[in-house]
């Protein structure tokens, strides 16, 4: 079982007198920066010129270039997209690190797959909230928190664990609980969850169900409601109380259908395919492919995204969501 730390376990916050540079001011960046500041930390933000720079300024932060922020900080938290981190680290962060500094991540991808190679004289750890930035910020402001993971990759000072827990405490995560892990475990389980279940698995399942109904002659609008729209209702029940709560909350007919039909859809062959996905994550195949795709300008990424956005389920969904003003995306989808 995972070891979990709470507020009572952080008796002395060893980072309170240190300067923390938050590199990036997107979903996680703004939440980390604001939570740390509210908890009395000395926070600066490191960015390239753009909308985020202006937003961080409006929010009252001292904003610098990435290099300037890294140079003056004791703790550098990198909250940029995975594919951008290696270049920014190499050009702007690495030259400004000093012995005893802390290099921090919210995901272990680049360290685990050797895209970022920290010097031996700095602490390296991760603190990864298990929720999007807006939720990290909102729950903190309400007096609660989102649980987080932490892991130490390199302990140059002998107090890297204390630093990691102090950072987690600073963003409020110790209110809910902070689970100890490793860079390897966090990276591989996170990627697997995204690919096999949360993103890849769910989208493939939803599309397959939609296509099955439409191909059988049912109206696309009904297929959308049954296979996509109502998914949130079921996921919310699982989120609140696990599979048991979902099954308790639905009809007996639905629960019996779950028991007799679910295993025929997600079969042993499906689990074998999941095993292959996991193996490709573990041996670096996925990482190498994604890194190569990014370096090539992401042609397949953009082409696939465009094709997926033209699928009938998306066309029907846009139409139906237009009839439901209470269903609005938090962020308008577009080109990344």
From Swiss-Prot:
One of its GO terms (cellular component) is cytosol. GO terms for molecular function: ketol-acid reductoisomerase activity; magnesium ion binding; NADP binding. It comes from Bacillus anthracis. Residues 2-181 form the KARI N-terminal Rossmann domain. It catalyses: (2R)-2,3-dihydroxy-3-methylbutanoate + NADP(+) = (2S)-2-acetolactate + NADPH + H(+); (2R,3R)-2,3-dihydroxy-3-methylpentanoate + NADP(+) = (S)-2-ethyl-2-hydroxy-3-oxobutanoate + NADPH + H(+). PANTHER family: KETOL-ACID REDUCTOISOMERASE, MITOCHONDRIAL (PTHR21371:SF1). Involved in the biosynthesis of branched-chain amino acids (BCAA). Catalyzes an alkyl-migration followed by a ketol-acid reduction of (S)-2-acetolactate (S2AL) to yield (R)-2,3-dihydroxy-isovalerate. In the isomerase reaction, S2AL is rearranged via a Mg-dependent methyl migration to produce 3-hydroxy-3-methyl-2-ketobutyrate (HMKB). In the reductase reaction, this 2-ketoacid undergoes a metal-dependent reduction by NADPH to yield (R)-2,3-dihydroxy-isovalerate. It is an enzyme of class 1 (oxidoreductase). This is Ketol-acid reductoisomerase (NADP(+)) 1. NADP(+) binds at residues 25-28, 48, 52, 82-85, 133. Its cofactor is Mg(2+).
């Amino acid at each position: 079982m995972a070891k979990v730390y709470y507020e009572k376990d952080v008796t002395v916050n060893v980072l309170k007198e240190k300067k923390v540079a938050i590199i990036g001011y997107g979903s996680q960046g703004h939440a980390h920066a604001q939570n740390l500041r509210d908890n009395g930390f000395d926070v600066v933000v490191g960015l390239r010129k753009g909308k985020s720079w202006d937003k961080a300024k409006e929010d009252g932060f001292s904003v610098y270039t990435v290099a300037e922020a890294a140079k003056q900080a004791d703790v550098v938290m990198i909250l940029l997209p995975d594919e951008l981190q290696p270049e920014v680290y190499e050009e702007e962060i690495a030259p400004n690190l000093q012995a005893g500094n802390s290099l921090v991540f919210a995901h272990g991808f680049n360290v685990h797959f050797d895209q970022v190679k920290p010097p031996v004289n700095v602490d390296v750890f991760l603190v990864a909230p298990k929720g999007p930035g807006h939720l990290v910020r909102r729950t903190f402001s309400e007096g609660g928190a989102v649980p987080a993971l932490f892991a130490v990759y390199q302990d140059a000072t002998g107090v890297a664990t204390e630093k990691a827990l102090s950072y987690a405490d600073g963003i409020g995560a110790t209110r809910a609980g902070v689970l100890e892990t490793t860079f390897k475990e966090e990276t591989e389980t996170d990627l697997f969850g995204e690919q096999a279940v949360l993103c890849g698995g769910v989208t493939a399942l939803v599309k397959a169900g939609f296509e099955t109904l439409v191909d059988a002659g049912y109206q696309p609008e009904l297929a959308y409601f049954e296979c996509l729209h109502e998914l949130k209702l079921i996921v919310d029940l699982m989120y609140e109380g696990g599979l048991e709560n979902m099954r308790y909350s639905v009809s007996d007919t639905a629960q019996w259908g779950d028991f007799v039909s679910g295993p025929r859809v997600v079969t042993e062959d499906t689990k074998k395919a999941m095993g292959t996905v996991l193996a490709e994550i573990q041996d670096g195949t996925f990482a190498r492919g994604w890194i190569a795709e990014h370096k090539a300008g992401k042609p397949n990424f953009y082409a696939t995204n465009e094709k997926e956005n033209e699928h009938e389920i998306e066309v029907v969904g846009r139409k139906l969501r237009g009839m439901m003003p209470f269903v609005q995306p938090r962020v308008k989808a577009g080109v990344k």
